[in-house]
Design a protein with these regions (language model features):
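Extracellular "complement/coagulation-type" protease architecture
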Residues: 1-248
Length: 248
């Protein structure tokens, strides 16, 4: 099957019940998040991800599918944007200390190598890794396809963005006692505004730099007041990420 035909099938055959994601976001400006990745199994959107190299995508370790169709340069999921690129994921590397989400959410990151490098265009770009860790109070943003955790709300067709502040470690520890480690960063806690299931692995972007990956949050409904989302703290893993890319 040609890539063009497959792309058409993906665009018009998306299963809209696949996932639930950004709550109360607004439509992103087209091509403003060119590093945003959608990880699909067939027509089902499973997770988000972020392009950090022409051949490498970073996502959450609990996005554990063996192979994905990796869609880049997307804005609308039902119409051709003419910026789309599709790759097949192959080789993947999960952080060695990750124990699985049933035991611990720590070290929740995974690298996917694409079968072919992407072409860098206005709609497909890499996002830089951080050189320092983000501080509390910094305004950041997340992105993804979806609205709320209520199934009667319409599944958004276009990429959604949401601004969220970084929450202090003390505040996050108070909300999740005994569960937050130095390898996690919290953001949000504003009523009705959050990432949610299916956004996993998507980017938390602060000042044009990747600072987090959507990882976990409240057990109950997403977007509860005073309960921030928890993200993998990417600044703690940059040496490992670069080593994997360099050696593979």
């Amino acid at each position: 099957m040609s890539i063009t035909i497959f792309l058409l099938l993906c665009v018009f055959g998306l299963n809209q019940a696949a996932t639930l994601k950004i709550m109360n976001g607004t439509e992103c400006q087209r091509n403003s998040q060119p590093w945003q990745v959608g990880l699909f199994e067939g027509n089902n959107l499973r997770c988000g991800g972020v392009l950090i190299d022409r051949r490498w995508v970073l996502t959450a370790a609990h996005c554990s599918g063996s192979r994905y169709w990796v869609r880049l340069g997307e804005h609308s999921l039902s119409q051709l944007d003419w910026t789309e690129q599709i790759r097949r994921s192959g080789f993947s590397v999960t952080y060695p200390s990750y124990q699985g989400s049933l035991k611990s959410h720590e070290h929740d990151l995974r690298l996917l190598r694409l079968g072919l490098p992407v072409r860098l265009t206005r709609g497909v770009q890499t996002l830089p890794l951080p050189s320092t860790c983000v501080t509390a109070g910094t305004e950041c943003h997340i992105s993804g396809w979806g609205t709320t955790n209520h199934p009667w709300n319409p599944y958004p067709d276009r990429l959604q963005c949401l601004d969220l502040p970084i929450v202090s470690d003390d505040t996050c520890h108070a909300v999740y006692p005994g569960r937050i480690t130095e390898n996690m960063v919290c953001a949000g806690g504003i009523a009705g505004q959050d990432a949610c299931q299916g956004d996993s692995g998507g980017p938390l972007v602060c000042g044009g730099v990747l600072q987090g990956l959507v990882s976990w949050g409240s057990v109950g409904p997403c977007g509860q007041n005073g309960i921030p989302g928890v993200y993998t703290k990417v600044c703690k893993y940059t040496d490992w990420i670069r080593m994997v890319i360099r050696n593979n």
